[in-house]
Amino acid sequence: MSITVEEKARLIKEYATKEGDTGSPEVQVAVLSSRIATLTEHFKAHKKDNHSRRGLLMMVAQRRKLLDYLKKKDEGRYTALIARLGLRR
């Protein structure tokens, strides 16, 4: 249901803007997107799991806030990230 330590480390390494970067919006959005995809698969089998669905909605909202922040600060980085992750908008 959650992502593994190795998967998270791979995402951090792939989306980091510099060495040791774990807090940039790009990294945070990539990790959230991976967790959202995992939970989406979970809901295909467990349709009535409303407790976890609330967590999913909170993650989607957090990702949206981070993307809005990135768009406001640097639209070029925003469009590049959207393209790399394959997100709509």
Swiss-Prot record:
GO terms for molecular function: rRNA binding; structural constituent of ribosome. Belongs to the universal ribosomal protein uS15 family. GO terms for cellular component: cytosolic small ribosomal subunit. It holds the Pfam family Ribosomal_S15. One of the primary rRNA binding proteins, it binds directly to 16S rRNA where it helps nucleate assembly of the platform of the 30S subunit by binding and bridging several RNA helices of the 16S rRNA. Forms an intersubunit bridge (bridge B4) with the 23S rRNA of the 50S subunit in the ribosome. NCBIfam families: S15_bact. The keyword Lipid metabolism does not apply. Part of the 30S ribosomal subunit. Forms a bridge to the 50S subunit in the 70S ribosome, contacting the 23S rRNA. It comes from Cereibacter sphaeroides (strain ATCC 17023 / DSM 158 / JCM 6121 / CCUG 31486 / LMG 2827 / NBRC 12203 / NCIMB 8253 / ATH 2.4.1.). This is Small ribosomal subunit protein uS15. The keyword Lyase does not apply. PANTHER family: RIBOSOMAL PROTEIN S15, BACTERIAL AND ORGANELLAR, SMALL RIBOSOMAL SUBUNIT PROTEIN US15M. One of its GO terms (biological process) is translation. Keywords: Ribonucleoprotein, Ribosomal protein, RNA-binding, rRNA-binding.
